[in-house]
């Protein structure tokens, strides 16, 4: 909206009519460049706010591994081979 207002003001001023084609293109390029930067900043700000709201609303009451405990046994135990009684 602001770039459109600036463009209209430039066109209404008498000096704007005195500008040649290249200068007018440079002005329009600068306006579009600023417009792109503003939109990018607003988009990034919106994404950050949504991410913060999502993280804040996510509550982790219990973890996935809450009820599990570590094993007291080793992973590889030696086998005790007993001879059968004779």
From Swiss-Prot:
Biological-process GO terms, alphabetical: antigen processing and presentation of exogenous peptide antigen via MHC class I; antigen processing and presentation of exogenous peptide antigen via MHC class II; cellular response to low-density lipoprotein particle stimulus; defense response to bacterium; Fc receptor mediated stimulatory signaling pathway; Fc-gamma receptor signaling pathway; immunoglobulin mediated immune response; innate immune response
Superkingdom in the source lineage: Eukaryota
Cytoplasmic side: 45-86
Record function comment: Adapter protein containing an immunoreceptor tyrosine-based activation motif (ITAM) that transduces activation signals from various immunoreceptors. As a component of the high-affinity immunoglobulin E (IgE) receptor, mediates allergic inflammatory signaling in mast cells. As a constitutive component of interleukin-3 receptor complex, selectively mediates interleukin 4/IL4 production by basophils priming T-cells toward effector T-helper 2 subset. Associates with pattern recognition receptors CLEC4D and CLEC4E to form a functional signaling complex in myeloid cells.
Boundaries of every ITAM domain copy: 54-82
Leader peptide range in chain numbering: 1-18
Stored PROSITE patterns: ITAM_1
Name of the protein in question: High affinity immunoglobulin epsilon receptor subunit gamma
Residues annotated with Phosphothreonine modification: 78
Organism in which the protein naturally occurs: Cavia porcellus (Guinea pig)
A single cellular component GO annotation: external side of plasma membrane
Pfam families, A to Z: ITAM, TCR_zetazeta
Residue positions where Phosphotyrosine is found in the record: 65, 76
Assembly behavior: IgE Fc receptor is a tetramer of an alpha chain, a beta chain, and two disulfide linked gamma chains. Associates with FCGR1A; forms a functional signaling complex. The signaling subunit of immunoglobulin gamma (IgG) Fc receptor complex. As a homodimer or a heterodimer of CD247 and FCER1G, associates with the ligand binding subunit FCGR3A to form a functional receptor complex. Associates with CLEC6A. Interacts with CLEC4E. Interacts (via ITAM domain) with SYK (via SH2 domains); activates SYK, enabling integrin-mediated activation of neutrophils and macrophages.
Sites of Phosphoserine modification: 69
Main localisation: membrane
